[in-house]
Amino acid sequence: TYDEGTEVTVTATPDDGYEFIEWDGNDNQSNSFTISVNSNITIQANFQIIQSNQNYYSSGDIIPIEPVVFYDRELTINGIKLLAAGSIGGQEAVPDSWVYKTAQVFKLLMESDAEGIDSDAQINMIKTLKGEIGWHQGYPAGQRIARGGGNEYSPNFLDDNRNQSYPGLEAFEDALALDDMVWYKNIDSQGTGDDDINEIIEHTLHTIHRFGVRGGVEGSTEALNIEAEEEDITNTDIFLAMKEAYTNGVFDIEGYGGDINNRDAWPVMLKEYQYLLTFGMWEFSEFWEGGSLSPEWNDNARTPSGIQANNPLGYELYNTYFKPVISIPSKEILREIFKDDDQGESGY
């Protein structure tokens, strides 16, 4: 209780980890101000959690999805929602151990203290993956994980009738930005640890490249646009680099129909090109069977020097947009995680 006309100083003092944002009942923008009391008034301070950049690096745990919509578990890692198929469609559930291994790979690809990482650009990449900013804002990136291949499920959860076969699946997936699958025990795999590494790195890169790297470095949203169905991409940096690789005999497109002018095939070509370019710049060809993926990717482009000589636009593209935001995972650590016959520990 104060006498009329009394001057009172009001101060909002936040707890650790919080910051003052505004007052209810007063328009003053400062966290401390003085007023003259002439009538009964109510003033309330509002606070919010301070969002530090480190908060964007998250290593969540597996939690159940209820009700089950083909996927029965999820885990969020650095803004990416991993979705694991349950025991459904005649298949056993993807084991938790493989979900953790997938999460650890994403973690290894986004090390904040790795050499050459631009911290601001990497944070922008994670914000883009979360759907907080960027070209798919409102739709967080997801990574689907299932067993073997689509035809290993009866009915196939990837075909046009999937919503009839698995009610609610389409609406569930439509709320996310999704690209490729990560397969546990891929039907094409020989069961070796190196096969697993190649499988999982390829498909996690597809997700990060499309939904995160495009959004990390300034200018990347335009430069790395592969959405050919939505707009003209013929003058983007990514398309020009891919076309140069094709023209120079580095990137063979027979597996994608063989027609460089087929716009419908461009998104897949560009997705695969980014993965192949990255493997070459990392010198990861040893994970390919026999150390080669020729003719799809020429043996002369399995090293940075080879790419610089034979696909200079790709070399520049990688160093400008990929290198500042994606960390190169250790081959030794990957081989500890992925050993032959499904052995190895995630370390997550």
Show which residues each predicted segment covers.
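Conserved "repeat-terminator" motif of extracellular CCP/Sushi domains
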Residues: 4, 33-50
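Low-complexity, Pro/Thr/Ser/Gly/Ala-rich linker/spacer regions in secreted
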Residues: 46-59, 342-348
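Acidic/His-rich structured neighborhood in mature extracellular/periplasmic domains
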Residues: 66-67, 77-247
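Post-HExxH zinc-binding segment in Zn-dependent metallohydrolases
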Residues: 213-290, 295-298
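N-terminal low-complexity, Pro/Thr/Ser-rich intrinsically disordered segments
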Residues: 50-78
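Pan-zinc metallopeptidase signature
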Residues: 272-348
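Surface-exposed interfaces of beta-sheet-rich extracellular modules
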Residues: 6-33
